[in-house]
């Protein structure tokens, strides 16, 4: 082969290779463009399928980057559609309660910057549970903690942390409040925050981080709310609020809120005489609350809320083993399901119970006179039979030698049923412990279980002599 033929042969081979490479690049480009614009259509409905009219909120939109021969292909991951909660699953059948969480706030305050709080509660969104409390605008090892036994000051704020995380200096202050309630409707958090003058307080309704609505005091006598979670069903949230005497007739109203906006207000009706600090839970299609009668009864009021027509009914827990403190001893206590028992009704403490068919699960202080100790049990017929007193499955949560305080319920949706959980406020400091000038709390949390369980006691556990004065 002469030199000219060699040159022609090499040129032909080079041209062929270049042509093949060019065609491969075109193929890669076409593939890239096709994949990019197709965007994995996430099971798009057929063109003739009717689409829902309600808005769809995209929780997150993740882009996954795949590298192929130095060519970048973007693949869209199907977004998760967030829906309102409806709580339509049945209630879990339980044998008792198992330990879930304890924040040890007071013990940690002996050597760290932890907020002074009271009125704690727990509420969950679809993924996590959070603890809330009303802060006093100060940490414990701080002179501002002196005399924090007072309930209503303008520096109190609603604190929010993931459950089990004590309220440290980095804790978020959700709103200004000396009375509050919070709940998640499936899309965002609603916070009801009350602050201001005793005779002219304001309730702010904060939804998804924005102030949406407000309402002023209607009886000019300490507007107040639940101090535990509200409940939302299909986008409508309900919260119980009271304004008026703490030891006489008061004006209780049930508010209905949609995305932070008040859409209806219903007055309390039924036989309950005095209603405060309700502990509410979803009982699809409605909401049920167990409350505090601070006037006439040591048996607890029941408020039933119809979420469809906004109607309200009220009565009292039937169990003759009553739930409030102070109360008569169990041999002489009574309840007829409809009326306050007029047994040591003045004063009281926030508490909880929930129905289980004809029976009732409940918690209360072990002491009938003081906020000391804490126990739970089931009363056979306690939801349907007047003055029923047959108690089973008793558990000690806090032994009688240690202090307790408020308690309340919260609900957690599982794969097949809705579980009931409760928290107990463990108060420390004044009035009882006069070595120190502050009043604060930690919490312990239990949840319903269908399994077996042991025994124990879970008090606050701080040595008051180790604490800042």
Curated annotation (Swiss-Prot):
Post-translational note: N-glycosylated.
Record entry for activity regulation: Inhibited by the neuraminidase inhibitors zanamivir (Relenza) and oseltamivir (Tamiflu). These drugs interfere with the release of progeny virus from infected cells and are effective against all influenza strains. Resistance to neuraminidase inhibitors is quite rare.
Intravirion side: 1-9
Needed cofactors: Ca(2+)
Binding site for substrate: 118, 152, 276-277, 292, 371
Binding site for Ca(2+): 293, 297, 324
Entry function: Catalyzes the removal of terminal sialic acid residues from viral and cellular glycoconjugates. Cleaves off the terminal sialic acids on the glycosylated HA during virus budding to facilitate virus release. Additionally helps virus spread through the circulation by further removing sialic acids from the cell surface. These cleavages prevent self-aggregation and ensure the efficient spread of the progeny virus from cell to cell. Otherwise, infection would be limited to one round of replication.
Description of how the protein assembles with itself and partners: Homotetramer.
Protein name (Swiss-Prot/TrEMBL): Neuraminidase
Lineage of source species: Viruses, Riboviria, Orthornavirae, Negarnaviricota, Polyploviricotina
Gene (name only): NA
